[in-house]
Structures are given as C-alpha cells and as structure tokens.
Amino acid sequence: MKNLFTNIILFVGLSIVFSGLTACSNTVSTQKGPVSETAPSVQNSNAAETKNDFPPVPTAIAQSEIKDLEGNTFKIEDKKGKVVLINLWATWCGPCRAEMPEFVALQEKYRDKGFEIVGLNTDNESVEEIKAFAEKMKLNYQLGYADGKILSEFIKITRLSGIPQTMIVNREGKMVLVIGGGGIRAVNNIKEMVEKTVNEG
C-alpha cells in the first residue's frame, strides 16, 4: 500500500489511520474528553503483506449479538467468508453523513463479490429516526446498533472516542484496516483497502 501519510508504524500488520480533524464527539462513548485533533496516522508497512499477518477481529466485536432495525440479531462472525466494512455512526454526525454516499457506491459496486457494509448506530437513536435517515440518504446496506462492548473495543484499538470509526474485515475474519475519524483521506484509504481485499478472493 502506498504511504499516504507521514507517520508509518508497523502494528501486527494492521493499518490504523487516525483522522481526528473530522471526527464528531461520541456521546455514547465510555471514554471522556474531546476527540484528539492531532492524533498521528498509522499504517502498515510492506513488511506485512500476507493475510495471515493481520490480527483477528476482537471477540467482543465478532461475537456481539447486534440488533438490527427489525429487532433481529446477527453477529459479525456469521459473515466470515465475506469482506465486511463495519462503520460506527450517528445521524447528527456531519463526517458520518459525508462519507455515506461513498459507502453506498462501494456496496453497490462490490455486493456481488461478497462485500457487505454494516452501519452501527452509536447513539441509540430510534428505529423510526434511523429508517427515515436511511431513506433520505438512500442507504443500501445493513444497519443496527453498536453495544457498549463494540464501542469499547473500537476505542481500545483507535484510542479515539469520536465517530465515524470504520473497520474492514477480510474473508478470514481478520482486521485489515481500522480508521478513526472521517474526511477525504480516510475515505480514500477505505476505498483502496476494500478494492484490494475484495479482489484477493
């Protein structure tokens, strides 16, 4: 992967990119304090290129029973064999809204290649609010709610208490990219990694 940022750190093969300049404060987070605006960007180096170099999705995220808008539950681990993008968001978050059209395009482009987006609301907004918002934004991917365990795990990884936050999981159930914050650079990294991971087969 090209080095899009100046600070590059090898972290078990996992790419972690912090874009705090365009993150919203997450009122649901258990971690207090403002979102960092000077957090360093972190990417993997070329030393870790194989699928096996990536760490598995934390159990708290993989095995959490996620409630969707119809009241049904599902788990991220049930989607093993697919490339999954997990996005933490809320309707009031500007950077979250800004990246959604890109997510819609990604879902449409790669749906037939086993790619799924799961958008998890972090603010316990009502089903009616979320459905109305999804219709307005023409969201074409699965929506649900992020529980405390999922939020805590994202914060542990990114050390960022704001949203949006995004994780890309490969077909083996391993994290290949985690991004804290939004913005053009974050979206470009997401698009690049989705294309690469989907086409790995």
Which role fits each region the language model picked out?
Residues 56-58, 63-84:
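A short beta-strand-turn-helix
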Residues 97-137, 147-154:
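Structural microenvironment flanking redox-active thiols in thiol-disulfide oxidoreductases
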